[in-house]
Amino acid sequence: MKRIVILLIVALLGQWMYAKDYQVSGPQGGLAMTLTLPDGFDIATDSCPLVILMHGIFSSKNFTPMPKIAKQLAKAGIASIRFDFGGHWSSEGEMQLMTIEKEIADALAMWDYACSLPYVSKIGLLGHSQGGVVASMTAGRIASQGHTAKPLYGLALLAPASVLKNACRNGSLFDAKFDPADPPEYVRCFKMMKLGREYLLSTQQLDIYGTAGAYQGPVRIIHGGNDRLVPMWCSEDFVKTYGEAAELIVVEGENHRLSKKTRKVAELVTAFFDTHR
């Protein structure tokens, strides 16, 4: 019995020692984030724009292309916050409980946090893959619901995966097959990642372009020419949604992960946010 008590105490101490101090929380709990500031930046006296970076499904703030984009933005004097959505990697929550609406709530919580930073002059949003859907809909919510503590000055979408709605409606998502009208408690993608019934049903009902279209500021959309996961029509439909405010840049030879020409992608993103600062 004494041995069991000691083991329990050690376990609890371990949890306490490695507990994370989350500054922002979403529907599933604390959100792990990384703030990157320009070199030599003094938060007491300086000010700069900031871009919130949103990763794709199953991905992380520390996976390509986010760290390189953050570094390139900093070189141009632009701060960034990249974070793990709820249920992903270092953030709290479960992947199986994740939905796109919950990720929008995460993004809005991060928006509110960025607005509270006194040295931030204006804010941009960037999203990759599912994060692109989240970023576009978040921008629309900000525009339509009056979240205007700081100006939203630009939106960058990297291979925005609006095809997820079609996939869930067709009952075929990545390598998972299911009845779209009555999906199981969860499906397993790539033999590891669980997506829950709530995700599979709610994604079918998203008004992606209708929500996104409320934002009328500048938009840059970047899509890899060799993207085999998200078809080009997704980006083309976003261009139709935003009209003349949007431009689509196709990076020839680039894949969906943006891992072959990451520097070029980071430079295109940075040039966009620097131009509109």
For the regions a language model picked out, list residue spans one by one.
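Catalytic nucleophile-loop/oxyanion-hole region of alpha/beta-hydrolase
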Residues: K61-N62, H88-P118
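Alpha/beta-hydrolase fold nucleophile elbow
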Residues: P118-S129
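The serine-hydrolase catalytic nucleophile loop
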Residues: F58-A70, F85, W233
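N-terminal cap/lid segment of alpha/beta-hydrolase-fold proteins
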Residues: Y18-A44
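Short beta-strand element of the alpha/beta-hydrolase
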Residues: D46-G56
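Conserved alpha/beta-hydrolase
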Residues: A70-E92
